[in-house]
């Protein structure tokens, strides 16, 4: 592995071979209309992962790209796809798979924004929406399809999503996708794709078993990985609050509300039931909160996301369905009401605050039973999680 120091970004990158570092978007030799879209999107210079991963993807190599939450991973593969697409061919040429519907829609938004001057078509193919509408859109020809595995496989099986011209498969948040839940569907989809399809795997965390699985459908991939010790985001202050028992968490949360001048905050619980319970209890105590989880119908989830994005709702209580990749600029505080069930999800959750290097605060509610889990997370990421100080309001 060739180590490349990023300088200002204070990250040590590793790659499996020498990777060209492109300091500017011009250095990537992109199509003129794509470059216009990038600048219109207010990107000035490529982020560290974009500087390294876009060129090998454009050259047709299989790539495993790992970077922190909030470093511009979505734009990395969106730019690469848009550069590779033949805009005169009204057939699906790139397929992006995501673990959640919200992430699939967000990717569609980014692709359409960056491809604004290219007359590119991109469809979000997700569960919870009209199958008839999907079929109509796909029949018309969509150059990029961004979707969730279940609905995408359904559309391929029905022959509404034609795969013969697909040349690129992107697996976003691949650790979650390749975990038990989606693994079989990914393999089913992969079998329908042309043999020469280029595969790009993108994620903040790549546990060993995921890397093993990628060997099954990637050929000599270029690996661009951040060293694990660097993975807890710089600029995010992490604290814990010791709560002797579960019942005390609610009072602690209410106390925090009074002391924190919040721009926007996300509160994570481990189950849908807990989200509903906490939302109800907060409202009874006259706090304004909104909530979202995977059991809600798609229309409701969209409306809640739009409200939160627009700033009408300031506090969102949710499950891990929200933790991966959802980009809301104003979030400065994350509270883990429940500690996450996996170390990887801890990173995805706290990566929500302070995107693109802006400051943020993460507060973990820790019962006696949770101490071991917290110490494990701390050790795994070589980070420090201190007891929350009294002046926490000044830190956000």
Curated annotation (Swiss-Prot):
Looking up PROSITE patterns in the UniProt record yields: HELICASE_ATP_BIND_1 (PS51192), HELICASE_CTER (PS51194), Q_MOTIF (PS51195)
Q: Which reaction does it catalyse?
A: ATP + H2O = ADP + phosphate + H(+)
Q: Does the keyword Cell wall biogenesis/degradation belong to this entry?
A: no
- Offer an example of a GO molecular function term for this protein: ATP binding
GO BP terms, alphabetized? mRNA splicing, via spliceosome; rRNA processing
Q: Where is the Helicase ATP-binding domain?
A: 54-224
Show where the record puts the motif Q motif. Answer: 23-51
Keywords from the UniProt entry: ATP-binding, Helicase, Hydrolase, Nucleotide-binding, Nucleus, Ribosome biogenesis, RNA-binding, rRNA processing
Q: What is its EC number?
A: 3.6.4.13
Q: Name one Pfam family in it.
A: DEAD
What range(s) does the Helicase C-terminal domain occupy?
Answer: 235-396
Q: Which InterPro entries match?
A: DEAD/DEAH_box_helicase_dom (IPR011545), Helicase_ATP-bd (IPR014001), Helicase_C-like (IPR001650), P-loop_NTPase (IPR027417), RNA_helicase_DEAD_Q_motif (IPR014014)
EC class (word) = hydrolase
Q: Domain of life here?
A: Eukaryota
Which residues take part in binding ATP? 67-74
One cellular component term from this protein's GO annotations in UniProt: nucleolus
Q: Provide the primary localization.
A: nucleus
Quote the subcellular location field of this record: Nucleus, Nucleolus
Identify the SMART domains for this entry: DEXDc, HELICc
Q: What does this protein do?
A: ATP-dependent RNA helicase involved in 40S ribosomal subunit biogenesis. Required for the processing and cleavage of 35S pre-rRNA at sites A0, A1, and A2, leading to mature 18S rRNA.
UniProt family annotation:
Belongs to the DEAD box helicase family. DDX48/FAL1 subfamily.
Q: What is known of its domains?
A: The Q motif is unique to and characteristic of the DEAD box family of RNA helicases and controls ATP binding and hydrolysis.
PANTHER family linked to this entry: ATP-DEPENDENT RNA HELICASE DBP3
Q: What is this protein called?
A: ATP-dependent RNA helicase FAL1
Organism field: Cryptococcus neoformans var. neoformans serotype D (strain JEC21 / ATCC MYA-565) (Filobasidiella neoformans)
What's the source species' lineage? Eukaryota, Fungi, Dikarya, Basidiomycota, Agaricomycotina
Tell me the name of the encoding gene.
Answer: FAL1
């Amino acid at each position: 592995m060739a180590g490349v120091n990023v300088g200002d970004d204070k990250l040590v990158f590793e790659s499996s071979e020498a990777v060209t570092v492109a300091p500017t978007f011009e250095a990537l030799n992109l199509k003129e209309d794509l470059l216009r879209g990038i600048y219109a999107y207010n990107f000035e210079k490529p982020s560290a992962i974009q500087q390294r991963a876009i060129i090998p993807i454009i050259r047709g190599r299989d790539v495993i790209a790992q970077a922190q939450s909030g470093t511009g991973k979505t734009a990395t593969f969106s730019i690469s796809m848009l550069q590779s697409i033949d805009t005169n061919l009204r057939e699906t040429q790139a397929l992006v798979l995501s673990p959640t519907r919200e992430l699939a829609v967000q990717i569609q938004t980014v692709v359409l924004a960056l491809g604004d001057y290219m007359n590119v078509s991109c469809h979000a193919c997700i569960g919870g929406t009209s199958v008839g509408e999907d079929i109509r859109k796909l029949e018309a020809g969509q150059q990029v399809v961004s979707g969730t595995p279940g609905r995408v496989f359904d559309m391929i099986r029905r022959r509404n999503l034609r795969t013969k011209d697909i040349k690129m498969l992107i697996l976003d948040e691949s650790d979650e996708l390749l975990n038990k839940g989606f693994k079989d569907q990914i393999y089913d989809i992969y079998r329908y794709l042309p043999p020469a399809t280029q595969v790009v795997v993108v994620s903040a965390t790549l546990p060993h078993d995921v890397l093993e699985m990628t060997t099954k459908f990637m050929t000599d991939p270029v690996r661009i990985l951040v060293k694990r010790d660097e993975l807890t985001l710089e600029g995010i202050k992490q604290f814990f609050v010791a709560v002797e028992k579960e019942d005390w968490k609610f009072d602690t949360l209410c106390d925090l509300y009074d002391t924190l001048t919040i721009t926007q905050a996300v509160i994570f619980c481990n189950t849908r039931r807990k989200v509903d319970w906490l939302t109800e209890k907060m409202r009874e105590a006259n706090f304004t909160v909104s909530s979202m989880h995977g059991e809600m119908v798609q229309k409701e989830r969209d409306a809640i996301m739009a409200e939160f994005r627009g700033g009408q709702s300031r506090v969102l209580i949710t499950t891990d369905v929200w933790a991966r990749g959802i980009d809301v600029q104003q979030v400065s505080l994350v509270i883990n009401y429940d500690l996450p069930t996996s170390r990887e999800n801890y990173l995805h959750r706290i990566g929500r605050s302070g995107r693109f290097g802006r400051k943020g605060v993460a507060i973990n509610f820790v019962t006696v039973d949770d101490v071991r889990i917290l110490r494990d997370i701390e050790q795994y990421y070589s980070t420090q999680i201190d007891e929350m100080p009294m002046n926490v309001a000044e830190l956000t």
